[in-house]
Design a protein with these regions (language model features):
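Short, proline-enriched alpha-helix->beta-strand connector loops that line the catalytic pocket
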Residues: 245-248, 342-348
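A domain-start/cap signature at the N-terminus of enzymes
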Residues: 1-25, 39-41, 46-202
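Active-site nucleophile loop of the alpha/beta-hydrolase fold
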Residues: 211, 255, 326-333, 355
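Active-site machinery of serine-nucleophile hydrolases
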Residues: 202-204, 211-277
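C-terminal catalytic histidine-bearing segment of alpha/beta-hydrolase fold enzymes
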Residues: 349-351, 355-358, 363-369, 373-445
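Gly/Ser-rich "nucleophile elbow"/oxyanion-hole loop immediately N-terminal to the catalytic nucleophile
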Residues: 196-200, 261-305
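Short, solvent-exposed loop/turn and secondary-structure capping segments
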Residues: 107-110, 215-224, 261-266, 313-314, ...
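Primarily recognizes the serine-hydrolase "nucleophile elbow" in alpha/beta-hydrolase
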Residues: 289-292, 296-342
């Protein structure tokens, strides 16, 4: 039997634990119906490659040596679809749904550094398909050429580079641009479209990534990993956008090293950063480029871990600039009186977890929060007892909620689950409880 080479596309989902291939779309030379295919019609072999070309060698937990990151993955469902993977009754494309697992992950690394991978798939036909117009059955299809990737969550996202360098540094960044069309608003009501307000100017959320999403030694990636390595794209989705009236810009700069780099130590505890003036210049540049569309009284800065530190550094350095700051598991040690005075000028909502393995709360957020409260600051702290999945998506083998390391509390921030204040009560605005994102959307400079 002669084999026929065909093309495929991947569909990427951006999840709490990074981007992963959730679906493969096969481009068929024939038309199929739903009852012509099932999960056993094809099988999928995956090789995870470094961008340099070689197969990723990975040491799995409990293993005594590294092994090639390759293998077969199970198909959960198969059905006719269009070229983008949307389900149809009849079509010339087939969607193969697969599970989130190591072999479908698109980023490799950890909290101190990561990199994008090139996942290469080889899909083989195992059962005959109908022919076209009475032709013989279709057999021997091999899908070994990827025509591209589809990621719905990246709609509206772009990458760019800072135009004017500061101290020789020009940051790469990603950004989400709202469409300013009523039908695209997170608040759009199809039954009353005329009621959807489209503002002339929209708020801006600046989000600062953690240590693992900096540029480091990677080349040619652009800033994409800064907002997909952890699910910063949640800020462009309906759940959080609706708090900002359905339209909010998102700016995600990427650090060349670490935001905590003070010019001497890359991860020191001096609470200083060489990137503070660079970031402020980038924000000013970005705002100037979109001056007719950004509300400068509603610029919110937020960040996780290393980026949580940088959130506080920017608020301390530019105390009259930001409407609010949302630092998550922020490593700010030994705050001075001057730090407290400066930080107290910006409304802040901290998120942290008890038992954080990397940023001890007793040395960072707890004393800083207490001093800010004592100074009369507008400050809140959501303090989780531990970190586990609260969405019902991720489960342990016994069916209980999946537990992760306690430093990873940002998954709760991105899932809009930060509501409770440190004293166990709700944060209220106009008598109604709000979470950190709604709170930040309702304050202004």
């Amino acid at each position: 039997m002669e084999l026929r080479s065909c093309t495929y596309a991947t569909v990427t989902t951006l999840g709490d634990f990074g981007p992963w291939i959730s679906k493969v779309v096969l481009d068929l030379p024939c038309t199929v119906r739903a009852n012509d295919i099932d999960a056993n019609t094809f099988h999928i072999y995956v090789e995870r490659h470094e961008r340099s070309g070689e197969v990723l060698m990975r040491k799995e937990r409990g293993a005594d040596h590294a092994a090639p990151s390759v293998g077969y993955i199970d198909i959960l469902a198969a059905y006719p679809c269009d070229e983008n993977g949307r389900k149809l009754a009849v079509g010339t494309h087939v969607a193969l749904e697969v599970a989130e697992q190591r072999l479908t992950k698109k980023i490799e690394g950890g909290v101190m550094g990561s990199r994008m991978l090139d996942d290469q798939l080889h899909i083989t036909q195992l059962a005959a398909l109908p022919g076209n117009d009475g032709d013989d059955l279709t057999c021997g299809l091999v899908f070994d050429t990827c025509r591209g990737d589809i990621c719905p969550a990246l709609k509206g996202w772009s990458n760019d580079t800072q135009k004017t360098a500061v101290d020789g540094i020009a940051l790469e960044y990603g950004f989400f641009e709202p469409s300013f069309k009523a039908e695209d608003s997170a608040c759009f009501n199809p039954f009353a479209p005329e009621a959807t307000a489209v503002p002339q100017k929209a708020p801006l959320v600046v989000y600062l990534h953690g240590a693992g999403e900096g540029k480091g030694a990677t080349q040619g990636e652009g800033a994409t990993r800064a907002y997909i390595g952890n699910r910063v794209t949640a800020l462009s989705q309906k759940q959080i956008q609706r708090y900002f009236g359905g339209f909010a810009w998102v700016l995600v700069p990427q650090s060349p090293t670490f935001w905590m780099d003070n010019g001497v130590e890359q991860l020191g505890r001096s609470n200083q950063s060489i990137y503070s003036p660079v970031l402020k210049a980038l924000i000013d540049e970005f705002v100037a480029e979109h001056a007719d569309r950004i509300d400068t009284d509603r610029i919110v800065v937020a960040g996780l871990s290393n980026g949580g530190f940088m959130t506080l550094r920017l608020c301390a350095d530019y105390p009259d600039f930001f409407a609010a700051g949302l630092p998550c598991c922020a490593p700010w040690y030994n705050a001075t009186d001057e730090d407290v005075v400066a930080l107290a000028k910006t409304p802040l909502w901290f998120t942290h977890s008890k038992g954080d393995e990397l940023v001890c709360p007793q040395q960072t957020v707890l004393p800083l929060f207490a001093r800010l409260r004592g100074a009369g600051a507008n400050v809140h702290l959501t303090y989780f007892s531990h970190v586990e999945d609260l969405t019902g998506v991720y489960r342990e083998a016994d069916g209980s909620a999946k537990k992760t390391f306690n430093h990873g509390v940002w998954i709760h921030q991105f899932n809009d689950l930060c509501y409770q204040d440190f004293d166990g009560g709700n944060v209220l605005i106009d008598g109604e409880p709000v979470g950190c994102w709604e709170w930040s959307a309702r304050v202004s400079r």
